[in-house]
């Protein structure tokens, strides 16, 4: 798998406009366990924002994981989706990301030296940003902080 990742990094280095990478979570649920996002054909609304973002037009707010759509960036016309639920969908909680980072670390470790250094570096940068976001500013630079 590490060789596969390296292959695509090599291909990406040869193209003039490498593809952008986006993360989505279609499966966020509310307190009753119901999906917040309607899914299916409505996923095109998110894909439209992604294409707008690639063209430099999609509105976003910077977070520790990258640009996230603003509340009004994704067309919700005709959807029964409140600002509160949309906010829940778009929320980036660094504390939740700590678990994701740990799982990613396990995956990267499985591939040992065959995991491309570029991917390890991206992972380490993300982990640092998340750690900094959950570490109170007065602890940065002290034991337990960054």
For each predicted feature, which ranges?
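Conserved NTP phosphate-binding and transfer environment spanning the P-loop NTPase/kinase superfamily
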Residues: 1-140, 144
């Amino acid at each position: 798998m590490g060789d596969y990742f390296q292959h695509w990094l090599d291909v990406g280095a040869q193209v003039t406009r490498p593809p952008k990478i986006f993360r989505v979570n279609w499966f966020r649920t509310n307190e009753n366990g119901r999906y917040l996002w309607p899914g299916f054909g409505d996923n095109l609304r998110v894909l439209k924002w992604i294409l707008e973002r690639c063209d430099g037009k999609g509105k976003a707010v910077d977070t520790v994981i990258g640009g996230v759509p603003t509340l009004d960036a994704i067309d919700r016309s005709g959807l029964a989706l409140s600002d509160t639920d949309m906010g829940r969908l778009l929320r980036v909680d660094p504390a939740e990301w700590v678990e994701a980072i740990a799982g990613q670390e396990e995956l990267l470790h499985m591939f040992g030296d065959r995991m491309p250094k570029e991917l390890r570096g991206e992972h380490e940068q993300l982990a640092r940003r998340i750690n900094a976001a959950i570490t109170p500013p007065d602890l940065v630079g002290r034991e337990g902080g960054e």
